[in-house]
UniProtKB/Swiss-Prot annotation:
Database matches in NCBIfam families: Hfq (TIGR02383), PRK00395.1 (NF001602)
Oligomeric and partner information: Homohexamer.
InterPro entries (alphabetical): Hfq, LSM_dom_sf, Sm
Protein name: RNA-binding protein Hfq
GO function terms (MF aspect): RNA binding
Protein source organism: Cereibacter sphaeroides (strain ATCC 17023 / DSM 158 / JCM 6121 / CCUG 31486 / LMG 2827 / NBRC 12203 / NCIMB 8253 / ATH 2.4.1.)
């Protein structure tokens, strides 16, 4: 049963990617990046802004804040 559940990180990133929700990413060194997540994998996130893409390694990310409220799961879970 646990194998067919998606982890929270992937569910969050996939939701903001599909919905093209603008995000603010804070890195562990305090740098703030803003844009739309266009792709991600186990190690990095591709962030797009003003026609430019930035590859950001997940180990450098502290926080990802969506620019609008999101609802990942529906129901009583």
């Amino acid at each position: 049963m646990a194998a067919d559940k998606q982890n929270l990180q992937d569910a969050f990133l996939n939701h903001v990617r599909k919905a093209k929700v603008p995000v603010t990413i804070f890195l562990i060194n305090g740098v703030k990046l803003q844009g739309v997540i266009t792709w991600f994998d186990n190690f990095c996130v591709l962030l797009r802004r003003d026609g430019q893409s930035q590859l950001v390694y997940k180990h450098a990310i502290s926080t990802i804040m969506p620019g609008q409220p999101i609802n990942l799961y529906e129901g009583d879970d």
